[in-house]
């Protein structure tokens, strides 16, 4: 209550809780996601050796998986070489991990729309930490596979990071936040494998667990709630029922969970959202396939060792981080779609250079263009999609998008590996180059409404 000069007192307006500063939110999301990705990517350079050790131990579960891999390799005509076999085995495990993300991401997003981002994030990170604890505590293939299953189901924290950024008020903050998420991915996939390659294999699971627990404590202490109670979905049951629509790929592509929710985008905007989701799926389907077969190509054509492949992926990650820091995060709101179209067009010569080049300079030029596209497309598309839906739908919207990406990453490597070994590298990469015209053409039809996006 305040008193004026005449002695009269008037009640002051109630003090409202201030929304968390956007810069702080983005910084916490970046550091938390980086810790999570470092824990996840520590495993990558150890995976071939880990699988070989389970094979030498004559693990019965590993043997049954190996027979399935051998059957698939024979079906697509892949040479019976141990190195190729380990890449294919690891890729199939990665596809299972992505498939579990596809199933869990929309449910996590719907839960966060009702209960808030913090509870959903803490629950996901607790599951991730549990997965590393299972891996560290036991050395059997069954325990390793169980840790991957728990981790895949719990990996909704990544889609929640995008939902938290989508909660931010201004389009410029959302755009920069999505770019910062891209930087975290680039740094995580650059530093994590490098660190894992130099550590003793028995140390890596415990370090991954340390990173995961540190991430959980960091988020507990510093992440503010970005979805206030008055903007949340009214019922978690309704959210789960809507999210169940996303277990159907067709319903997923139609954003059915969003369309049936409260205050959904309608008309042209709903059509644009569906088009953007299709572009996201097609891009990651093609891109993840090229990414997976790249290990086959450089070993077959250039005889790259594991160390040389590590250097190659370090170059890709460092280039992506540089482009995201210097260019992608500076893209103005409304210009994201134009940047995505340019990046997708760059993938056409990139695919041809990689698929047809027989010299290291040509390969390097292709990888440079490939890295540019990888640095731009996902952050910009995520930023645009974040503008759709009411505040209480952001988790479902971004969970849907993440689920589309996980589905693409689950099937893309299998299809690309089949095409690579059945038709050859040149045909595989040429067909992929031509198919990149599909998402580009869809974006041309969506450009006008997409540029005028604003939070609903």
From Swiss-Prot:
InterPro entries xref list: MFS, MFS_dom, MFS_trans_sf, Sugar_transporter_CS
This protein's UniProt keywords: Apoptosis, Cell membrane, Membrane, Nucleus, Transmembrane, Transmembrane helix, Transport
Organism superkingdom: Eukaryota
GO biological process: apoptotic process
Subcellular location: Nucleus inner membrane; Cell membrane
Residue ranges crossing the lipid bilayer per the database entry: 25-45, 87-107, 125-145, 149-169, 179-199, 204-224, 278-298, 311-328, 343-363, 365-385, 422-442
Protein family (similarity comment): Belongs to the major facilitator superfamily.
Function: Probable organic anion transporter which may serve as a transporter for some non-steroidal anti-inflammatory drugs (NSAIDs) as well as other organic anions across the luminal membranes of renal proximal tubules at the final excretion step into the urine.
Name of the protein in its database record: Major facilitator superfamily domain-containing protein 10
